[in-house]
């Protein structure tokens, strides 16, 4: 667990730039560190922020390679916290906004799981 704490510390100190890939990935890595440290609300916030950053820097307004993946991670954590309505909203947003994203190919199974 100490390495995850160290990772979170270093990633919290990272200054994101205005790029489409590296900065959003670093913020998502912080989300992964928080998830391993069981700081789940912080993890969800980090994944949502990473998706937003990736979209903001994308020429199309939606980063199909990263954003859907980050939002699915956030949704899975929300499900683990029994926040299925919030997870469902994320999954539905993915289905609507990231139609052509590789990660969205199986989004229906996430939607179905969150509605049970």
Predicted features and spans:
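Short solvent-exposed coil/turn linkers within tandem alpha-helical repeat scaffolds
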Residues: 2, 16-24, 52-67, 94-107
């Amino acid at each position: 667990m100490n390495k995850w704490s160290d990772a979170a510390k270093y990633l919290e100190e990272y200054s994101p730039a205005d790029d489409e890939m590296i900065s959003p990935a670093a913020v998502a890595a912080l989300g992964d560190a928080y998830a391993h440290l069981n700081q789940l609300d912080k993890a969800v916030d980090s994944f949502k922020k990473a998706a937003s950053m990736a979209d903001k820097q994308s020429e199309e307004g939606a980063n199909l390679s990263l954003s859907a993946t980050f939002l699915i991670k956030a949704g899975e954590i929300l499900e683990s916290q029994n926040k299925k309505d919030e997870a469902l909203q994320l999954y539905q947003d993915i289905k609507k906004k990231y139609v052509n994203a590789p990660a969205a190919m199986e989004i229906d199974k996430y939607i179905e799981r969150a509605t049970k």
